[in-house]
Amino acid sequence: EPSINIANQSFSSNKVDVNLVTPDNWQKIEPKSSMRDSEYIIRNSKGEFNLIVFKNIGGSVDQNINRWINQFSGDQNEKMPLISKEIERNGIKFTFLQNSGSFNGGMGQSEEFDNAALIGFIVQNSQNTYYYKAVAEVDVLHESKENIIDTILKSSI
């Protein structure tokens, strides 16, 4: 069974708001939509992709996770099988989602394509809920998977 090691991260403080401390390969850009809180281009040796951040958008965590899952169809890629996992640290709840297959398009990401993958996080603190979502070709996203997980977990707590 696929697993992801997010439970053993160390957490130091209880921030009320998220301020991403990003690696050098993350470039903050002007969000392409007013619905987006922020947006980053992440580059690696396989290519580049956008990580989109929403803040306090509608729907429950489960509704958003299910919507993201349903944006994919067909066979999953063994590098990025469906994983949905929740952890809580210092009063902050993290919901991690990974999925792959054929991307059917979604809000602000209407281009359909095959061999796609998604990494998503929903981070809930006492005041806000942040939604992090990246969709890209499997090999491109897989190369940055641990980098994304580490950055979001370490910056959110």
What is the predicted role of each segment?
Residues E1-N14:
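Sec-dependent signal peptide cleavage junction
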Residues D17, G58-Q63, F113, D139-E146:
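Soluble non-cytosolic domains of exported or imported proteins
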Residues N19-D75:
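Secretory pathway targeting signatures of secreted, lumenal, and periplasmic proteins
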Residues P23, D62-I69, I119-G120, K145-L153:
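Extracytoplasmic/secreted envelope proteins and their assembly/folding machinery
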Residues W26, Q127-I157:
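Surface-exposed amphipathic alpha-helical segments
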Residues K32, N66-V123:
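Signature of long, low-cysteine stretches enriched in small and polar/charged residues
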Residues S45, N56-G58, S100-N104, Q127, ...:
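Solvent-exposed coil/turn segments that connect beta secondary-structure elements
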Residues N50-G58, G108, A134-H142:
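Second-shell loop/turn segments in exported
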